[in-house]
């Protein structure tokens, strides 16, 4: 009888796999990693990790000696506990590609040894695990398939992986792998569907909170009121809470909430419930029109030849260009000739805009600045640009230091 290696094998080294492997090595000890994508695998070997995650790179360097690298997928046959940690891809509006994940697992199937534990940590839709049992593992009754819910927040994911308050698992026929007892926090063990719906439920709740804020903001605009004035007292209501997602915005972005919203909408059979989500999405998508109206108002008094967008991601703590205010702006302004983009924290790849690498060198007249986020140092440079060109600046950020430094900035939410 072949004795399998019991230490975890982590397959899929996108953001999620990086967090899992480094977090495991840091807290629990030795692990092995692999990825069928050589670019991701080599980047991980070289320590080119997600820069937006605090302490991830330093923790990797400290614990790299605990991480072993597989050279070939045939080596997977030696491992009993296999974690699938590839991030489910999303497009520019947050639509998930679950077929990619399905094919990723299907192609690995011949490498899964007898009596192995396959733990899915990737983002899935309700019914995905059952589909794997039916369409992939129907002839592999020896395999124990587990779905482990991922609820990590970008920017703080490593800490949350190492110190979870709870973990939800979906299992079949009470098959719970011993290795999962390494996690000493509160565990909730459900069937596949309940665990999968929990993950979706969290994001749907957050989506409804954002929708509430934007809905009331719309109502305030029609009734000579400011929603911004309501946020602080709303947070003091214990039924709402200080950590609630009730800040008005230009709509959800980043792709992570959108992934589950799209999944729930597509899998709902109840017509009324499906319509509720549909119209909330419509309201969310229309929020970008606030920016369009501000720009139109400014253009009545100022010729706008160039636009400088500061802060390309959906937030400064984590990088994603999926469904961001910038991507929405580009989608609705396809004919714009001069769009410049600068980011204080992330290296940008050339897209449909011109990348500014040094704000001090920006020297374009007739410019409108749209501010999302920036470092304090760069905000001071922006102040000098505003003074030099006498240009308008629209602040679309939720909370920033900009308004304290540039008094004439136009708040999108006022």
Residue map of PLM features:
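Structural/interface elements that position substrates and couple domains in central-metabolism enzymes
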Residues: 1-414
């Amino acid at each position: 009888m072949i004795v399998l290696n019991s230490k975890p094998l982590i397959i899929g080294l996108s953001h999620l796999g990086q967090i899992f492997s480094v977090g495991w090595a840091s807290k629990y000890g030795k692990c092995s990693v692999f990825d069928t994508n050589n670019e991701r695998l080599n980047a991980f070997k070289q320590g080119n990790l997600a820069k937006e995650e605090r302490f991830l790179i330093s923790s990797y360097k400290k614990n790299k000696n605990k991480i072993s690298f597989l050279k070939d997928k045939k080596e997977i046959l030696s491992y009993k506990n296999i974690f699938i940690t590839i991030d489910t891809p999303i497009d520019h509006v947050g639509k998930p590609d679950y077929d990619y994940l399905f094919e990723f697992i299907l192609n690995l199937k011949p490498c899964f040894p007898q009596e192995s534990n396959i733990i899915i940590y990737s983002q899935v839709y309700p019914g995905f695990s059952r589909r794997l049992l039916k369409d992939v593992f129907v002839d592999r009754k020896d395999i124990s398939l587990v779905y482990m819910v991922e609820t990590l927040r970008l920017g703080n994911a490593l800490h949350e992986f190492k110190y979870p308050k709870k973990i939800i698992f979906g299992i079949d026929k009470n098959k719970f792998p011993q290795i999962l007892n390494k996690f000493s926090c509160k565990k909730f063990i459900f069937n596949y569907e309940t665990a999968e719906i929990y993950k979706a439920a969290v994001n749907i709740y957050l989506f409804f909170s954002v929708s509430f804020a934007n809905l009331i903001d719309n109502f305030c605009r029609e009734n000579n009121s400011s929603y911004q004035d309501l946020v602080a007292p709303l947070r003091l209501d214990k039924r709402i809470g200080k950590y609630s997602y009730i800040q008005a915005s230009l709509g959800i972005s980043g792709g992570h909430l959108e992934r589950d919203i799209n999944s729930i909408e597509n899998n709902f059979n109840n017509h009324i419930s499906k319509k509720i989500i549909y119209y909330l999405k419509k309201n969310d998508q229309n929020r970008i029109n606030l920016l369009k109206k501000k720009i139109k108002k400014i253009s009545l008094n100022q010729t706008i030849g160039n636009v400088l967008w500061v802060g390309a991601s959906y937030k400064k703590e984590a990088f994603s260009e999926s469904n961001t205010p910038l991507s929405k702006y580009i989608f609705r302004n396809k004919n714009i000739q001069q769009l410049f983009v600068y980011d204080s924290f992330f290296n940008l790849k050339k897209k449909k805009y011109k990348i500014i690498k040094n704000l001090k060198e920006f020297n374009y007249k007739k410019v409108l600045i749209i501010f999302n986020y920036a470092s304090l140092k760069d905000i001071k440079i922006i102040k000098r640009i505003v003074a030099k060109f006498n240009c308008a600046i629209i602040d679309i950020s939720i909370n920033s230091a900009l308004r304290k430094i540039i008094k004439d900035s136009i708040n999108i939410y006022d």
